[in-house]
Amino acid sequence: DHAARLLRNGGYHQTTLREIAEAVGIRKASLYYHFASKEEIVEAVVNDGVRFVHEGVFAALAATVGEAPRARLEAAIRGHLAALHGHGDYTTASIKVFNFGAAPAPESVRAVRRAYEEVWSRLIAELQQAGALPAARAPEVLRNFLLGALNGSTDWYRPDRHDIATLAQEFTELVSPAGT
């Protein structure tokens, strides 16, 4: 939890192992008993952040099996936003430090992200097949746009100003206007 909070606030380059150790209440050298490197700590935080969101979306989609694709889209958006803002330190840190500085993200991080993107690609394909999205739209561009917009809400979302369910409806309307 401490590493996620520090990474959320400082990012990869500004967060040091010394800060993480101090936040946990141990010596820096003791961190190496649990993790081989800073990159391994970051990898764990990023994977947990993506997993929290992935689980939220899976639960939302499981609850809407058999419903119209547009309803499933709204549920997935709501699940993503609820998990994103419900596990803020992990999820925001995972967005902020996905690219580990100059080094490419580890394969485990890329694999988790690809699996999550595939969920959205399938959902977009459902929407296109149902006529809720124009078939001419490039699914990958739409997926990246939508995930970027949802993840970008970490910069401006305030629970006292926006309700997650209402926000999910608004995002859904932007992506797939009613009547399309």
Please state what every model-predicted region is.
Residues 82-86, 122, 126, 136, ...:
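Amphipathic C-terminal alpha-helical segment
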Residues 44, 58-88, 142-146:
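Hydrophobic alpha-helical connector segments
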Residues 48-58, 86, 104-130, 139-144:
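Amphipathic alpha-helical packing segments from all-alpha helical-bundle domains
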Residues 2-9, 52, 56-63, 149-156:
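Solvent-exposed, amphipathic alpha-helical segments
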Residues 17, 39, 43, 47, ...:
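Short, structured helix-loop boundary elements
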Residues 12-13, 133, 162:
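Conserved hydrophobic residue
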Residues 2-40, 44:
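Helix-turn-helix
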Residues 84-104, 121, 155:
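Amphipathic alpha-helical segments used for helix-helix packing
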